[in-house]
Amino acid sequence: MADILNNMIPVKRAGRQTVLFSNPPAIISSATVVGPMEGKGPLGPYFDMVLKDDTWGEDSWEKAERKMFEHTVRGAMDKVNLQSGGVDCLLGGDLLNQIISANFAARELKLPFLGLYGACSTMAESLLIGTMLIDGGYAGRVACIATSHFSTAERQYRNPLEMGGQTTPTAQRTVTGAGCSIAANPTLEGDRLYGNVFVTAGTIGKVTDLGI
């Protein structure tokens, strides 16, 4: 039976971890929002929006993070004149417990939602799963997003800012920002393809402990 099934199902893999797309999805749009510190860096001119205040007019950093998530998805959709009905699935997350910023944003966006908690891998994971959905014929367009906020991450992982702890100039700093890409089956887009960016394959990572 296994041999029969293997002959029926086309294998779109290379090795144990890499999947190959027979109809490579296209990246048709993207949008970004970042905080003031990120805007001062070398990539500052390339971001769609740089906030002047990392609370963005909200009364908590968590609400600002939720706002970044929602605004970035809507921004990517607006660039290619997509309404909510034109996106089949939203994939993404943040760094907080129960990916609360992403969940509250998804409530407002009213899109079918797959919440992901991959920390720094969330963007790559959302693109990988999203493009697999497209190549498999389960979705025509997907929105893939990751967001984080320095101040919420400090509370979650390190030292809440209210403690007033000092850090060294070389200390790690979690990004305040959000980035969204919209991937699509290129046969749906026609002249709307805004570049030659396609996802042709993806490699699924694995947890490795070298015992160090």
Question: Where on the chain are the PLM-derived regions?
Answer:
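Active-site-proximal alpha-helical scaffold in enzymes
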Residues: 117-144, 183
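Short, well-ordered, mixed-charge alpha-helical segments that flank or form enzyme active sites
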Residues: 99-100, 150-155, 206-210
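Conserved beta-ketoacyl condensing-enzyme motif
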Residues: 27, 61-120
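Condensing-enzyme catalytic core mediating Claisen C-C bond formation in acyl metabolism
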Residues: 2-62, 160-212
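Secondary-structure boundary elements
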Residues: 78-83, 132-141, 184-193
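Short beta-strand segments
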Residues: 28, 92-93, 142-148
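Solvent-exposed alpha-helices and their adjacent loops that cap or buttress functional pockets
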Residues: 16-20, 82-83, 105-108, 122, ...
